[in-house]
């Protein structure tokens, strides 16, 4: 069967509970048919909690997706209660509280998996009920907190993680400001973990930041999540891509394809690097590494995708 056509959009003239009409920002998912008719809607302002600010208040004010502000790079974002409506960090419908940047479809139960840059990774059913949430536990209301996946090790033992997502005696880590939360051909979840706001804070030095390609195994019946593969942490700040980016598992080659789209973004005068990688899944050997340079300093690349012409045109 053909996959549904799913789009992330904002909604014009959205009426809030206080009667104010706003234009929402990246917090609506719609399904359209081939004629473009809307056949279903996931309104995240009702499904999630648009007032949760646990990660929003820990972000680097220098870059939020393609909005780059070098004057505030390295500074922790400040959330103001009277932030104007529009494409700005803030809570509530009409501000950039969710920032959905990918949608995956899980055919086995007719559900979607969204990457919400400012909240976490969330699976939602056709009935608009949250199935699970992959994110640190801080700030979720009682109903949504019950949907949080519990981190475990390879033997199924619970890991000890605090509300900010910091876990003891383990390589497990949550994703922060992530992109492309996609299902692999193995049924696992692969994510580009950008890593801004890691541990719901800004580090003492900006150069302590890092990004990862990461893979999780989720047991929906038990409500657990196990980290089974990662790459990039060991490469440190030189591999750090604060915004955009993508990874995708390649079954035919048993490799992880990845693209860090914003390396060196905050380095004044330096070209921003878009780093294309193919990493051997078993050995983590770098099979391919290509640096794509931007023609303008401090401007980001967005994504790189693998194209299979024979499949496209057959």
What is the role of each PLM region?
Residues 4-314:
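Histidine-/acidic-rich catalytic cores in large beta-rich domains
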């Amino acid at each position: 069967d053909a996959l549904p056509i799913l789009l992330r959009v904002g909604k014009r003239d959205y009426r809030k509970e206080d009667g104010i009409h706003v234009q929402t920002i990246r917090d609506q998912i719609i399904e359209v048919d081939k004629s473009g008719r809307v056949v279903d809607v996931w309104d995240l302002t009702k499904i999630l909690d648009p007032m949760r600010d646990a990660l929003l208040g820990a972000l680097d004010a220098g870059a939020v997706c393609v909005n780059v502000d070098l004057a505030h790079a390295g500074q922790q974002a400040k959330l103001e209660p009277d932030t104007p409506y529009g494409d700005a960090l803030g809570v509530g419908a009409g501000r950039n509280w969710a920032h959905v940047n990918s949608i995956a479809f899980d055919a086995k139960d007719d559900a979607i998996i969204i990457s919400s840059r400012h909240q976490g990774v969330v699976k939602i059913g056709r009935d608009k009920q949250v199935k699970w949430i992959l994110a640190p536990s801080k700030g979720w209301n009682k109903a949504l907190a019950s949907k949080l996946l519990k981190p475990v090790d390879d033997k199924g033992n619970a890991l000890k993680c605090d509300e900010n997502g910091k876990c003891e005696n383990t390589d497990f880590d949550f994703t922060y400001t992530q992109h492309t939360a996609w299902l692999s051909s193995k049924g696992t979840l692969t994510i580009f973990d950008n890593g801004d706001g890691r541990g719901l804070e800004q580090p003492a030095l900006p150069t302590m930041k890092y990004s990862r390609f990461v893979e999780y195994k989720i047991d929906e019946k038990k409500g657990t999540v196990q980290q089974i593969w990662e790459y990039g942490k060991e490469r440190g700040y030189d591999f750090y891509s604060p915004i955009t980016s993508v990874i995708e598992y390649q079954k035919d080659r048993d490799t992880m394809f990845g693209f860090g789209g914003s390396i060196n973004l905050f380095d004044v005068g330096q070209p921003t690097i878009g780093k294309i990688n193919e990493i051997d899944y078993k050995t983590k050997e770098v099979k391919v590494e290509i640096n794509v340079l931007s023609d303008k300093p401090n401007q980001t690349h967005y994504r790189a995708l693998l194209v299979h012409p024979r499949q496209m045109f057959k």
